[in-house]
């Protein structure tokens, strides 16, 4: 009986070690796809978000289900700013799917990193426009910034940093 449990535990660890690089590569590919799509079309397809959420199954941890709560602040902002100039539903769903992979604390840290980059870039673009005396306002996509934050936190977690 004890030999069986040791065998299955060892097999589970070996299987997880095989799945981790697969998850990492697919996660990066999907994050790049989200970024490119959001920059070019100003929308994030549901299929990419479902793909990211499905990746959480490769290294499933029940506590990561709470990560979906990382979408709540984005949902609140989206509901408050419904004039078409706020964040969109794609950003809300992206935050939730990233939270499923990263967990609640990882998802929140990824959001902080992504939003910090977003705000600093927005300020930089605004200063550039004022310096060049340009009046047009181009919307800045949030998806690429969330993707960078998620990649940073993901590899911090893989590297052993507990968040």
Question: Which residues does each predicted region cover?
Answer:
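A membrane-topology feature that recognizes alpha-helical transmembrane segments
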Residues: 1-163
């Amino acid at each position: 009986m004890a030999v069986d449990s040791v065998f299955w535990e060892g097999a589970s660890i070996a299987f997880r070690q095989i799945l981790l690089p697969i998850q990492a590569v697919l996660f990066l590919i999907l994050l790049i796809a989200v970024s490119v799509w959001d920059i070019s079309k100003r929308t994030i397809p549901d299929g990419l978000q479902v793909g990211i959420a499905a990746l959480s199954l490769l290294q499933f941890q029940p506590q990561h289900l709470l990560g979906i709560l990382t979408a709540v602040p984005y949902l609140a902002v989206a509901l408050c700013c419904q004039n078409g100039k706020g964040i969109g539903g794609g950003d809300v769903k992206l935050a939730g799917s990233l939270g499923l992979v990263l967990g609640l604390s990882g998802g929140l840290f990824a959001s902080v990193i992504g939003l910090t980059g977003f705000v600093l870039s927005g300020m930089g673009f605004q200063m550039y426009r004022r310096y060049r005396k340009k009046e047009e306002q181009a919307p800045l996509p949030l998806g690429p910034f969330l993707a960078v934050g998620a990649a940073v936190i993901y590899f911090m977690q893989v590297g052993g940093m507990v968040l």
